[in-house]
Swiss-Prot record:
Family, as annotated: Belongs to the rotavirus VP4 family.
Positions in coiled-coil regions: 483-510
Species assigned in the record: Rotavirus A (isolate RVA/Human/India/116E/1986/G9P8[11]) (RV-A)
Residues covered by region (Spike head): 65-225
Record's protein name: Outer capsid protein VP4
Motif (YGL motif): 447-449
Length: 772
């Protein structure tokens, strides 16, 4: 592009420090995904790869292989694989309900000739025949269904690793492994004779494997156990909790102690409560459109009892990997539209940062052996009514997800007053019944939890569990370790941004049209609108650099190539989804910064893409300084910024970026070819008409594609429908029509001064769209 601002936006590159680069890398990873790290995040840097985050070695909820355990005779829990590793031949497994099933497994050693053996099993002496001529171990199942029957062999497993596994499902059916891996028929078989309450007797050392890890169990059968297998901590499965106990739920255990430091293990029962919060932003216009329904980080303080002691707790909830949906019924001002709304899905994660006033959190700096167990939480959405000016209100209702604990790490919560060392509990989302829908629309039977009303009728969601950690703390209990990297207390940027957005949008009605046109006559661009805020060139340069970093990752930086592809690919159908912004080529206050201009020119020459070279958007300039849509946007921003109470250097780049993405989303652009005008909109509509009569003619897509490469592209403040309506009702001269097509500000001002309702209404509608 030829204008300075777009050279800066699309091609400029400044030297930045490491934190800026990490922030930029993080921004590239959130394409079509809403990422809300939270008000009280662990650090200011976004993760390079979105996902569940770091998983520590001691944070697995269920260990894939837990054991070994000594032989056991009990009613073992269902839906777990019990992998036995016998050291001697003989009966290694038996089960009976004394009415419908008697079953046992006999291990036959390699190279055993056929012989008869007598075994004592389940209070019965049994004579069986065994043989194994091969070089591998053979597990043979013997089976009968009544006490009067004789045992007979049913199935067998041949394995080189002396391993067999058993599982009892929820119905009580027994499954184990049959066949041989050497012959390619290793498989899981099931005896459909339910024994749900029968005692299982394991006569060998065994390991416990969750049912979800069946493939791993099969690999152990085929290839043997790992070289080293030790139990590092209490596993959360029923058997281990019942048979072992490392510590009571709430106690402090001194592991080691020196003169200055000691290691203390903290075991705590905890109750985690959290409350989802959201942003619901209504777009401008007649009241039928919503621009955003999104999750936002939220903190919550509460108390609960632990061993008779009141605990004061503080949580902060945030989300990651949220899916973004939209709904659009049409382009009319009265068509119901939701541009973006967030939904928690299977790929989403919920983070809850937890802190309480107990001793465990006083010195949480040097920590090891961090473990936690939490129950599941089901979150069910409620109702949210979209209050339309006329007609029945659509209602978004339903939706549900189940949160399953997925890990725990250390974090730091930054509030406006204090920094808190915390534990960040990570929950994985799974969709559940019921689905959500919006009444009166096509949105129905979708699964997930939308952000419209994620709390439903709940005051808070609650998860109970416990955690354990070993912390290196001072030997003097009265001393508290300083929180690392917390030199100053960070003010809540998101809260300030919300206040600024709200104040910004409330000022829309206070801008006079005549004042707006006066401002639009100035050589405004997205930088010069802030010329009154920074008084020195150096400050202006730094501020411009900060804004540029924000812009480089926005949709605006990609819009030119997107429109080029759309025009090239569509033969007669113009459609595009991203926003193209025209630029004003007039010199602004920022052109005085010579080093920025020189750097920009060099970068443009070196890095301009082929598509950008072909699609050259030339600015249409006359002696009147033509007004463009960007001038309207810039004038609104400048006027509102002058009235805002809060102006912060960190927040302004964020506001500018949001303005570039969301200001005047319904745009029109036109090309003038002699007495013929081509006009396209960002909503995919296109038409051509004559300047003399405003009669619509056939849209020549090939001619338009040719013109758009070499001719000026004008932002149409007064679109074709408005000009035609003005001509039909008031009558305008050919010269006035041409000036309207060229967006001549003098003509616009004259119509506004005459209180022309058609032109005035058009400008007012543009201003109403200027919302963030």
């Amino acid at each position: 592009m030829r204008s300075l601002i777009y050279r800066q936006l699309l091609y400029n590159s400044y030297s930045v420090d490491l934190s800026d680069e990490i922030t930029n890398i993080g921004a590239e990873k959130k394409e079509n995904v809403t990422v809300q790290i939270g008000e009280f995040a662990q650090s200011q840097y976004a993760p390079v790869s979105w996902g569940s985050g770091e998983t520590l070695s001691g944070n697995v909820e269920e260990q894939p292989l837990d054991g070994p355990y000594t032989p056991d005779k009990s009613n073992l829990p269902s839906n777990y694989w019990y992998l036995i590793n016998p050291s001697n031949d003989g009966v290694v497994f038996s089960v009976t309900d004394n009415s419908t099933l008697w079953m046992f497994t006999y291990l036959v050693l390699p190279n055993t000739a056929q012989t008869s053996v007598v075994v004592n099993v389940m209070n019965e002496t049994v004579n069986i025949s065994i043989d194994n001529s091969g070089s591998a171990y053979k597990f043979v199942d013997y089976f009968k269904t009544s006490s009067a029957q004789a045992y007979r062999s049913r199935n067998f497993l041949i394995t080189a690793h002396r391993l067999q596994a058993y599982k009892r499902d929820g119905d009580g059916n027994i499954s184990n492994y049959w066949g041989s891996d050497a012959y390619g028929d290793l498989r899981v078989g099931t005896y459909f004779n339910p024994v749900p309450n029968a005692v299982i007797n394991l006569n060998a050392d065994f390991y416990v494997i969750p049912d979800s890890q069946q493939e791993m169990c099969t690999e152990y059968i085929r290839r043997g156990l790992p070289a080293i297998q030790t139990t590092t901590y209490v596993t959360p499965i029923s058997y281990a909790v019942r048979s072992q106990r490392i510590a009571r739920p709430n106690e402090d255990i001194t592991i080691s102690k020196a003169s200055l430091w000691k290691e203390v293990q903290y075991n705590r029962d905890i109750v985690i409560r959290f409350v989802f919060a959201n942003n619901i932003i209504k777009a401008g216009g007649l009241g039928y459109k919503w621009s955003e329904i999104s999750y936002k980080a939220n903190n919550y303080q509460y108390t609960y009892m632990r061993d008779g002691i009141e605990v004061v707790a503080h949580t902060t909830v945030s989300v990651n990997g949220v899916s973004v949906y939209d709904y659009n019924t049409g382009s009319l001002p009265t068509d119901f539209t939701i541009r973006n709304y967030d939904v928690l899905k299977e790929s989403s994660f919920v983070y809850v940062d937890y802190w309480d006033d107990s001793q465990a959190f006083r010195n949480m700096v040097y920590v090891r052996s961090l473990n936690a167990e939490l129950n599941q939480v089901q979150c069910v959405g409620g109702h949210y009514s979209f209050a339309l000016p006329v007609g029945s209100w659509p209602v978004m209702q339903g939706g549900s997800v189940v949160l399953t604990f997925d890990g725990v790490t250390l974090s730091t919560q930054f509030t406006d007053y204090v920094s808190l060392n915390s534990l960040r509990f990570r929950f994985r989302c799974a969709v559940s019944e019921p689905p959500f829908r919006v009444t009166g629309t096509r949105i129905s039977n979708l699964y997930g939890l939308p952000a419209a009303n994620p709390m439903g009728d709940q005051q808070y969601y609650e998860a109970s569990g416990r955690f354990s950690l070993i912390s290196l703390v001072p030997s003097n209990d009265d001393y508290q370790t300083p929180i690392a990297n917390s030199v100053t207390v960070r003010q809540d940027l998101e809260r300030q941004l919300d206040e600024m957005r709200r104040e910004f949008n409330e000022l829309s009605a206070n801008i006079a049209l005549s004042q707006l046109i006066d401002l639009a006559l100035l050589p405004l661009d997205m930088f010069s609108m802030f010329s009154g805020i920074r008084s020195t060139i150096e400050a202006a340069k730094n501020f411009a650099t900060s804004v540029m970093k924000k812009f480089r990752k926005s949709n605006l930086a990609k819009s030119v190539n997107s429109l080029t592809d759309a025009i090239t690919d569509a033969a007669g159908s113009i459609s595009r989804s991203s926003t193209l912004r025209s630029a004003n080529s007039a010199v602004s206050v920022w052109t005085d910064i010579s080093d920025i201009v020189d750097s920009t020119d060099n970068v443009v020459t070196a890095t301009a893409t082929a598509a950008a070279k072909k699609f050259r958007v030339k600015e249409f300039t006359t002696e009147f300084n033509g007004v463009s849509f960007d001038d309207i946007s810039a004038a609104v921003v400048k006027t509102k910024m002058n009235k805002l109470n809060v102006v912060d250097e960190e927040m302004l780049p964020q506001i500018i970026t949001e303005a570039s993405e969301k200001f005047i989303p319904n745009r029109a652009y036109r090309l003038i070819d002699g007495d013929k005008v081509y006009e396209v909109t960002t909503e995919g509509k296109y038409f051509a008409y004559l300047t003399e009569t405003f009669e619509e003619v056939m849209f020549d897509a090939e001619r338009f594609a040719e013109l758009v490469t070499y001719s000026p592209v004008i932002s149409a403040i007064i679109d074709f429908k408005t000009i035609k309506n003005l001509n039909d009702n008031y009558g305008i001269t050919r010269e006035q029509a041409l000036n309207m097509l060229r967006s001549d500000p003098k003509v616009l001002r004259s119509f506004i001064n005459q209180n022309n309702p058609i032109i005035k209404n058009r400008i007012e509608q543009l201003i109403l769209q200027c919302r963030i």
